[in-house]
Amino acid sequence: MGRRSALALAVVSALLCQVWSSGVFELKLQEFVNKKGLLGNRNCCRGGSGPPCACRTFFRVCLKHYQASVSPEPPCTYGSAVTPVLGVDSFSLPDGAGIDPAFSNPIRFPFGFTWPGTFSLIIEALHTDSPDDLATENPERLISRLTTQRHLTVGEEWSQDLHSSGRTDLRYSYRFVCDEHYYGEGCSVFCRPRDDAFGHFTCGDRGEKMCDPGWKGQYCTDPICLPGCDDQHGYCDKPGECKCRVGWQGRYCDECIRYPGCLHGTCQQPWQCNCQEGWGGLFCNQDLNYCTHHKPCRNGATCTNTGQGSYTCSCRPGYTGANCELEVDECAPSPCKNGASCTDLEDSFSCTCPPGFYGKVCELSAMTCADGPCFNGGRCSDNPDGGYTCHCPLGFSGFNCEKKMDLCGSSPCSNGAKCVDLGNSYLCRCQAGFSGRYCEDNVDDCASSPCANGGTCRDSVNDFSCTCPPGYTGKNCSAPVSRCEHAPCHNGATCHQRGQRYMCECAQGYGGPNCQFLLPEPPPGPMVVDLSERHMESQGGPFPWVAVCAGVVLVLLLLLGCAAVVVCVRLKLQKHQPPPEPCGGETETMNNLANCQREKDVSVSIIGATQIKNTNKKADFHGDHGAEKSSFKVRYPTVDYNLVRDLKGDEATVRDTHSKRDTKCQSQSSAGEEKIAPTLRGGEIPDRKRPESVYSTSKDTKYQSVYVLSAEKDECVIATEV
């Protein structure tokens, strides 16, 4: 099992070597002859089920570097191989795969380095009893051994050889061929044809790169540009094109780009504008020799350059215009008189006079007023120099008043008025809003003061507009603005216009001038509220005394009801209170209080004036320590002395000593001695011999202090403010 694993590992190694190899040494075993079937030690091959001396032959091949004295021992530096059993005694081996699919003839030894040109070869023929046992370490299995060293050049041709040892003959052949894409004497030149971004080439016989048409460079990655493309200013990404770099243009990128806007200039480098002769300025757009370049003057006029891009033309007689392009029409001012016809000449004019007239402009007449030349009632007068003049009546013209005039032809009427020709005069029928002889005046539509209620009138064509004061609207400001227009009533109320006022008809449950208040008890029907003048934006009307009185009565009734409820509650509370205990016939009083009353409720703390809340109300000091104990109140009319703090903790002590105090109150005289309690709530008093320390005073100067006695005080003493 271990040998099979070793064989599989060797095959995988050989395959990996083939992947990365540059060439392959190939050994072809052709024929092996073992005439007597003997081993190398002349013993007969035994074992197995075949005939005696039948040697089941397999081969071990070892390829190593060139050695002058070849050693058959490992390592096989170039590779080794062990074949399966290929035959018995004498046999021939065909090319390709044999009986055993694990063997292929020739045996291949891939190389991952340059072929050195020399090698040493060891071929051992071995015998095995079992096809599964292909161990080569046992020398007893050896049939024959071939050791040789050779020089070998790379090529496709096989080198034939025959090894004879006397008892055995081995005929074999070998060669070294380069792997695909490898070339050269040692298969060290790598060349793989490609046509992509990394190259465009094929490979020659010796592995040289032969660029595809249109490509050049060491790896054929540089395209050959269009023939004539400038080497510096042009480039290409693929063969046959010529792309220009920035600032250059043209088919071959040999033309510089001029400065933008340059008209009559050239450049030697990009963005230049070198003006041509006769041109100036930043953009070479100012013609310094306009007359020569443009020849603007026509009709034989003389051109004179007057500056950059300017000129003047001196026209010949009979021509005018900036470039003398206009021929002067000498007949334009109608120089011919008396109905003569004018003919324009190149530099003058000619008048063709009607019968009876002569002169350059036919100004002279051969007729007189005696001949009656004037028509249509024209008045004739003789001229001192000869001839006559006809004074035409209105509506006629011409030298002899022979032409009837169109009085409306000159459009004398303005502002779209229609002109009516009356023969001797005309009449303008004006459009609405205009007046005057020629309808030139706009009729003042505000003259009649159409705007009412102090509105301002603005006149327009056959119309007017009024700017109304607040409270009015309409064409003439005659319509008052509706007070309900802006929806003053709230909560679904209905607005009613009442002249200059409005009224809100409130929905059930709402009230107020604008129905903005929610009523606690809505009236049974809808409420109509007449707004006061403060809400109506106008003054006038009586003050609503009835509503005010009704409101006051409602408030008083409410207060009386509350007072009655309070009195009832207090009466019920007094009924549930226990009756006060009698003082046992004690008649001695102090500050209108009996001794028993003074004895009770003396267990209070000393509180400074700064700790008393002044509320300007009557203070109610009430102590309730049980049903068996009566209560009393000390009233201070202006100060509320809050003495509730920490009184509950002393209730038990007060209950225990209550009966003892009552007895004491009855037997004690008014001049009895005071016994000081050992402790006070205001603080500990370590010395019992200082009775005056029981009554402490506050240092507060704003208010007087309340003297507080301990609950354990024996005498019936009450503290008060003096």
Swiss-Prot record:
Recorded name of the encoding gene: Dll1
Domain EGF-like intervals: 225-253, 256-284, 291-324, 331-362, 369-401, 408-439, 446-477, 484-515
GO cellular component, one term: plasma membrane
Disruption phenotype: Heterozygous Dll1 mice mutants are lighter and smaller, with altered fat to lean ratio and have increased blood pressure and a slight bradycardia. The animals have reduced cholesterol and triglyceride levels in blood. Heterozygous Dll1 mice mutants and hypomorphic Dll1 mice mutants survive until birth, despite significantly reduced Notch activity. Conditional knockout in inner ear leads to an early and excessive production of hair cells and have vestibular defects.
Numbered residues of crosslink Glycyl lysine isopeptide (Lys-Gly) (interchain with G-Cter in ubiquitin): 613
Effect of residue 699 to R: Decreases Notch signaling pathway
GO biological process, one term: skin epidermis development
TM spans (from-to): 546-568
Protein role: Transmembrane ligand protein of NOTCH1, NOTCH2 and NOTCH3 receptors that binds the extracellular domain (ECD) of Notch receptor in a cis and trans fashion manner. Following transinteraction, ligand cells produce mechanical force that depends of a clathrin-mediated endocytosis, requiring ligand ubiquitination, EPN1 interaction, and actin polymerisation; these events promote Notch receptor extracellular domain (NECD) transendocytosis and triggers Notch signaling through induction of cleavage, hyperphosphorylation, and nuclear accumulation of the intracellular domain of Notch receptors (NICD).
Membrane topology: Single-pass type I membrane protein
Subcellular location: Apical cell membrane; Cell junction, Adherens junction; Membrane raft
Domain DSL per the UniProt entry, residue ranges: 176-220
Organism: Mus musculus
Highest taxon listed in the record's lineage: Eukaryota
Region (Interaction with MAGI1): 719-722
Protein name, as recorded: Delta-like protein 1
Site label Cleavage, positions: 527-528, 535-536
Keywords carried by this UniProt record: Cell junction, Cell membrane, Developmental protein, Differentiation, Disulfide bond, EGF-like domain, Glycoprotein, Isopeptide bond, Membrane, Notch signaling pathway, Nucleus, Phosphoprotein, Repeat, Signal, Transmembrane, Transmembrane helix, Ubl conjugation
PTM sites of type Phosphothreonine: 638
Signal peptide residue numbers: 1-17
Main location: membrane
Quaternary context: Homodimer. Interacts with TJP1. Interacts with MMP14; inhibits DLL1-induced Notch signaling. Interacts with MAGI1 (via PDZ domain); forms a complex with CTNNB1 and CDH2 and promotes recruitment to the adherens junction and stabilization on the cell surface. Interacts with PSEN1; undergoes a presenilin-dependent gamma-secretase cleavage that releases a Dll1-intracellular form. Interacts with MFAP5. Interacts with MIB1. Interacts with NEURL1B; leads to ubiquitination. Interacts with NEURL1.
Coiled coil segments of this chain: none
Region spans: Disordered: 655-697
Residue positions the entry lists as glycosylated: 476
